[in-house]
């Protein structure tokens, strides 16, 4: 069963004005950048974004604790999640933008792609001879969830790139237009 904040707790924030500040610019940036489109076609309001992020964070924590049999305490989790909600709602602290955008969405909840919470990553090309596609697969996978990827040039000149062979029949590869399809194409 997923972690959810109590309805009574959330109710007190539904009509509360968020302290965006900056003469409306803060709210404009929030609506443009972090407010996700809901199933009904409307954008999330701040209280809904905070709820999604907090519940997503606690779902991740609950899954980890239960997987390793560390003793989930539902009462303590509800209490600390409410404190986290209140602090985020009032902008006493904010998670990173990537967290506001992806935490608690299908990307993290269903697919388990927590890499989407990262801004950037790095991959080395040093061992290209061992696995030619590995750094490129990593780069594609991370890029497809919005992570910027840096790389080194240690693998430069470790193999020669030649043009296509023209003396054979061409083959057609159909790549599924999904994140997984494009990653697999590497």
List PLM regions with ranges.
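Extended catalytic cores of very large enzyme megasubunits
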Residues: 1-185
């Amino acid at each position: 069963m997923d972690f959810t904040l109590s309805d009574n707790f959330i109710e007190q924030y539904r009509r509360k004005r968020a302290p965006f500040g900056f003469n409306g610019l803060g709210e404009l940036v929030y609506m443009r950048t972090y407010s996700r489109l809901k199933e009904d076609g409307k954008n999330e309001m701040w209280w809904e974004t905070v709820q999604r992020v907090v519940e997503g964070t606690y779902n991740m924590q609950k899954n980890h604790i239960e997987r390793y049999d560390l003793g989930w305490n539902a009462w303590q989790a509800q209490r600390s999640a409410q404190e986290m909600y209140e602090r985020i709602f009032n902008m006493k602290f904010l998670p990173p933008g990537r967290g506001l955008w992806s935490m608690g969405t299908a990307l993290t909840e269903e697919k388990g792609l927590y890499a989407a919470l990262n801004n950037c990553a790095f991959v080395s090309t040093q061992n290209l001879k061992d696995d030619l596609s590995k750094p490129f697969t990593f780069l594609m996978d991370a890029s497809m969830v919005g992570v910027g990827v840096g790389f080194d040039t240690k693998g430069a000149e470790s193999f020669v790139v030649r043009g296509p062979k023209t003396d054979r029949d061409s083959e057609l590869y159909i790549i599924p237009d999904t994140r997984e399809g494009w990653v697999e194409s590497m």
